[in-house]
């Protein structure tokens, strides 16, 4: 009986020793109890999108979720997500934007919806819009003094195209298709000196500002009926008048004494008034500034009208036989 008790005690001691040995082995190797065979990775549903609104249904937290004033964390998360979703749905489909800043020197948008100084080249007080496929005069900066918009498709100059441009000195619209100019488009430009409009389709001249010094309307379709009888009388600063290659049948009357150069070649002029250039009653008067008159390319015979140009320092260029 004592032997049986001794054997039982020995077996119990061996089991205790074995258990202690296993515990020490597991504490030395934390991965000893990790069996990778128990973990299976499935790629079939790897790209499945998890909806956060029912996230607490996918994972059962049980009693582990903390309570926030009687509301579970999962419920609170779902509530906030729902509120943010509803807020996103109520955003306006066409949100309003703030008014863009004023363009200043860039000027307002032109034909292409861009500011003028992005379509044209603005250098100081000069604006260059040559060959820019423009159909109208673009809005210009208020400081513009020189405008070059040559070789475009401009067909009409409107009354307000140059409104407020009190510093504008030169307009060059050569090589467009301008057929008409509103009468008020130019006359209110106090600083305008040079108006350059050759190679257009003008049939008449508008009222011009008294500040004009150079007027170039060569190669248009101007007729004598399209020039008012007193069109040039008040232009006391006009020095250069170029009317060549038009459809004129008479020399414009009332030319100012300031005129230095008059080009009328290649028109349809057949006759000349006695007072076209000189005062028939004042034989001692000499019109010295007017030294350059061209009438070549016209059917007129200048030798038939000597009294019309006796006061000139030089004979006009043209046919005398």
From Swiss-Prot:
A Pfam family this protein belongs to?
LRR_8
Site (Cleavage) found at 20-21, 104-105, 109-110
Q: Which GO terms describe its biological process?
A: angiogenesis; articular cartilage development; bone development; collagen fibril organization; negative regulation of angiogenesis
Q: Does the keyword Disulfide bond apply?
A: yes
List where in the cell it is found: Secreted, Extracellular space, Extracellular matrix
Each LRR repeat occupies one of these ranges, namely: 143-164, 167-188, 191-212, 237-258, 259-279, 289-309
Q: Which SUPFAM superfamilies match?
A: L domain-like
> PTM Sulfotyrosine: at which residues?
61
Q: Which UniProt keywords apply?
A: Disulfide bond, Extracellular matrix, Glycoprotein, Leucine-rich repeat, Repeat, Secreted, Signal, Sulfation
Listed as disulfide-bonded, the cysteine pairs are 278-311
- The LRRNT domain sits at 105-142
For the keyword Phosphoprotein, the answer is no
Q: Which family does it belong to?
A: Belongs to the small leucine-rich proteoglycan (SLRP) family. SLRP class III subfamily.
Tell me how this protein assembles.
Answer: Homodimer.
- Name of protein: Opticin
């Amino acid at each position: 009986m004592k032997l049986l008790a001794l054997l039982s005690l020995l077996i119990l001691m061996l089991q205790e020793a074995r258990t202690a040995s296993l515990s020490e082995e597991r504490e030395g190797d934390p991965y000893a109890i990790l069996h990778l065979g128990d973990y299976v990775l499935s790629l079939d549903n790897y790209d499945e999108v998890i909806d956060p609104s029912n996230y607490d249904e996918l994972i059962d937290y049980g009693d582990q979720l903390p309570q926030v004033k009687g509301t579970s964390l999962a419920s609170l998360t779902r509530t906030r997500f729902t509120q943010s979703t509803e807020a996103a749905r109520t955003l306006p489909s066409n949100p309003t934007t703030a008014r863009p800043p004023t363009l200043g020197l860039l000027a307002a948008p032109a034909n292409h919806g861009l500011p003028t100084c992005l379509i044209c080249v603005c250098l100081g007080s000069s604006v260059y819009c040559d060959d820019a496929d423009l159909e109208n005069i673009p809005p210009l900066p208020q400081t513009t003094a020189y405008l070059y918009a040559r070789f475009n498709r401009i067909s009409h100059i409107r009354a307000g195209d140059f409104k407020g441009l009190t510093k504008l000195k030169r307009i060059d619209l050569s090589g467009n298709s301008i057929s008409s100019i509103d009468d008020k488009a130019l006359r209110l430009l106090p600083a305008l000196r040079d108006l350059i409009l050759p190679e257009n389709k003008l049939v008449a001249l508008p009222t011009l500002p008294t500040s004009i010094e150079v007027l170039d309307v060569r190669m248009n379709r101007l007729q004598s009926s399209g020039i008012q009888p007193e069109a040039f009388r008040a232009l006391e600063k006009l020095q250069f008048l170029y009317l060549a290659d038009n459809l004129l049948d008479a020399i414009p009357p009332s030319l100012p004494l300031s005129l230095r150069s008059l080009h009328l070649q290649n028109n349809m002029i057949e006759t000349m008034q006695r007072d076209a250039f000189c005062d028939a009653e004042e034989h001692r008067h000499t019109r010295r500034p007017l030294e350059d008159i061209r009438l070549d390319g016209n059917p007129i015979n200048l030798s038939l009208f000597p009294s019309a140009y006796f006061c000139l320092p030089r004979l006009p260029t043209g046919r005398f036989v």
